[in-house]
Amino acid sequence: LRVEGREIISVDPDAYVIDALFFMKRNNIRRIVVSRSNNILGIFSVDEALYHIINNDVESKLKDAKLKFPVIVKSNELKEIMRSMIDNDTDAVIYDNKIITYKDVISQIDWSKSNALIGELSKEAIFVEPYTKIKTVGELMLKNKIRHMPVYGIVSSRDIVYNYDIDLNLSINKIMIVEVYSVSKEESLHTVVSTMIKRNIGSVIVTNSKNIEIVTLKDLVTFALSNLIY
C-alpha cells in the first residue's frame, strides 16, 4: 500500500516569515517548503511559525529562520513512510517532489483491522484556563512540543499562527475553539479516526473519570506502526 501525498507548496528563502504566515493563513495550510531551484532548505511549519511569533521575530527572512530539517524518503510504501516519520520525529516527509503528512498516512490505514478502544491510546493532556495569555499558551506548546491544548474548549498552534497579528497578552479564549470533538475512552478507535478524517481535525479529547486526556495524529501513526495496522 502506497501513500500518494500532495504537491509541494514552496516559497523562496528570501521571503520573510511574516509573508509565510500570511500565506499559510490565506491558504489554510500548516507547512511550506522553503526551496530555491529545486534545492530544499527546510520546512516552515506551524511549529516554527509559533516559535517566531512568540519570540516576536516575524521580520526575519526564511533563510535565517528556524526550519525543520527536510526528511526525503526513497519509498512511498505506507509502512516505510510511518517508520520514517516516527524515527525522525516529523509530521511530514518528501517523496518524488510531493509531501506526505500524518493526515495522508492516517487516511490510508485500514483502521477496521483494529479492535482497540481510543482510551488505549490517550494520554493526560496539558490544559490551561480560558484567561491564560496567548503568549503563555504558545510558550507551553513550544516547551512541551505539543500542538493542541484543552481550554474548556481547545486551542491549537495553528489557531495562534493564523492570528499572528493579535496581541499576545490577550486571553486564549479570544481564539480558542469552543466546540470540541470529545469521546468516551470506551469509543472504538475505528469510529474515532473515521470522524477525525471526516472533520479534518488533528486531535480528540478523551473523557474519563479522573483526567482530561488527548489523542493526536502522531499517537495514531505510532499506534498503527507498533500494532502492524496498515
Predicted regions and their residues:
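Hydrophobic "anchor" residues
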Residues: I40, N211-I212
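Short acidic/polar active-site loop segments enriched in Thr and Asp
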Residues: R30, T90-D91, R147, G202
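Conserved functional loop/turn residues at catalytic and ligand-binding sites
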Residues: N28, K145, E179, N200
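Tandem CBS (Bateman) regulatory domains
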Residues: L1-E7, I43-V71, N76-N88, Y95-F127, ...
